[in-house]
Amino acid sequence: MKFEITKFQSLNYMGHEAFNTLSANLSFAGGDIKKIMVTSCSPHDGKSFVSMNLMRSFSQIGLKVLLIDADIRASMLQKRYGIKIQDEGYKGLTEFLAGRAKIEEIIAQTDIPNADMILAGKTVNISFPLINSGHLDELFGAVVDQYDIIVVDTPPIGAIIDAALIAAHCDGVLLVLRSNYTTQAELKDAISQIERSGKPVLGTVLNQFDTWKFGKKSESHKYYYNNSYYRDNSSKSEKGKEKKKKNKD
């Protein structure tokens, strides 16, 4: 089975460099850090954007990577990135957690070399029983030795319990923050929940940093990871749309 990703925007030079730095830093975290959860404090912070670009960056440095879309309540990843599925009867993570699909049925190659994906599948309103079913342990146990890196894109941490539960199955957490939006209280609460899972915060990514607000005329947003950043070029009209309607995560 294969997925075709039809709406994956190319990054500019700074974007490639920043994600290369981020993926390299994460790969240097140690051999015991393979399952990396990517989450945020609230919807529309850009966690899925970071997850997808991490998948691409890891694959470009020669690592075999698996991206798991674990937002089984409200995933927009397939729609946003125009992911076309060859098999119309594809079953995703939800179906596997419910015991209605096998592991080999939910993993698919993408058109990016070295990069495989598991999509969320059918969305559900109540996810707690599925995440706690024991099948998540089974999944990670089966794939951890097949890949160099596993990126797990989860719902935002805090509003619902899903991300905190999934964190317990991962080796560390990357937290995506939205510039001029994420509050200190939200950040503290997110870190507290991650720490209660017993897993380390591997780093934070500052997303949608707008240089216009700081007197520098630039039609771009900067995204920071520690001392690295990239610009995602966007027009003023896109910024206007952001004010009227939040971009889907």
What are these regions (language model features)?
Residues 2-16, 20, 24-31, 40-44, ...:
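P-loop/Walker-type NTP enzyme "switch/lid" segment
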Residues 2-5, 188-249:
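Hydrophobic micro-sites
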Residues 37-39, 119-120, 152-153, 175-178, ...:
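Conserved beta-strand segments of the P-loop GTPase G domain that flank and frequently precede/overlap
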Residues 47:
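Conserved lysine of the Walker
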Residues 50, 54:
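Hydrophobic positions on the alpha1 helix immediately C-terminal to the Walker A/P-loop
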Residues 58:
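Aromatic pocket-lining residues of Rossmann-like dinucleotide-binding sites
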Residues 76-77, 126-128, 184-185, 211-216:
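Switch/connector loops and helix/strand junctions flanking conserved nucleotide-binding motifs
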Residues 142-148, 159-180:
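Inter-motif core of Ras-like GTPase G domains
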